[in-house]
Amino acid sequence: MNAGPINYKVKLPSGERYTFIKSTLSARNLYTVCEEAHCPNIAECWESGTATFMIMGSNCSRGCRFCAVTHGRMLPLDPMEPEKVYESVKMMNLDYVVITSVDRDDLPDKGSSHFAAVIRRLKDLKIKIEVLIPDFSGVHKFIDKIIDERPDVIAHNIETVRRLTKTVRDPRAGYDQSLNVLRYVKSRSNIITKSSIMLGLGETDDEVIETLHDLHDAGVDIVTIGQYLRPTKKQLEVKEYSPMERFKNLEESAYSIGFSFVASGPLVRTSYRAAEAFVKGGFKND
């Protein structure tokens, strides 16, 4: 394992498409997780016409120790947000859109009705819709609101191995709770499910493989594995930088376990090349 940083090549944000998307989002006071979480793939994804919209505000009610999303005062939801997202996606002429959100533990339904309203509005565009959801405190009736809108993919991230969960994630999150969310989605539908694991927080390969088995047993179809990169000095330090060989070996292990599609590499994130995962995984709409 490498103790020091490896030269992970990241394209700097630039280009006409990038500038257009950034100005479109700013004009509508919309947020992307690409910006808020300091995603290293922002240039590549935006230039290819893909963006992950982050709804329900820019402040999160939780404080996971790996995440750069802010935790300030929780503001009221914008009732016009479903329309703003719809208009932005339409203007960008996207074929595949990813919607995620901050946690809103301050709201009675954890924001599930608002999240569902955004999906419902986007359905009018006849495009592929992937959602990366919070755990909604594990409450089934809140998760049902998302399932009932029938997005093409429902993702929820396990983030790390069982042993490190309490160190890495907010106390209100949980390893088993995340598995239960994914298991419940699959039990109620045939919607494609997806999750993600970060490397570099002190986990062992055996622990990662155990987590892959847990995710597969919960019915997860797609898994992504990426390197944790410390966003700012406020977040957890990187314990190790994994070489490409480690990502390749874990990808092979994941496929042998039975996942339909695996993306594994230093800069891979949950929504990275999401449309490709849908196509190469051999998935089809009902």
From Swiss-Prot:
Its cofactor is [4Fe-4S] cluster. InterPro entries: Aldolase_TIM, Elp3/MiaA/NifB-like_rSAM, Lipoyl_synth, rSAM. Gene3D superfamilies: Aldolase class I. Pathway: Protein modification; protein lipoylation via endogenous pathway; protein N(6)-(lipoyl)lysine from octanoyl-[acyl-carrier-protein]: step 2/2. Residues 46-260 form the Radical SAM core domain. Its main location: cytoplasm. It is found in: Cytoplasm. HAMAP family: Lipoyl_synth. Belongs to the radical SAM superfamily. Lipoyl synthase family. This is Lipoyl synthase. It comes from Picrophilus torridus (strain ATCC 700027 / DSM 9790 / JCM 10055 / NBRC 100828 / KAW 2/3).
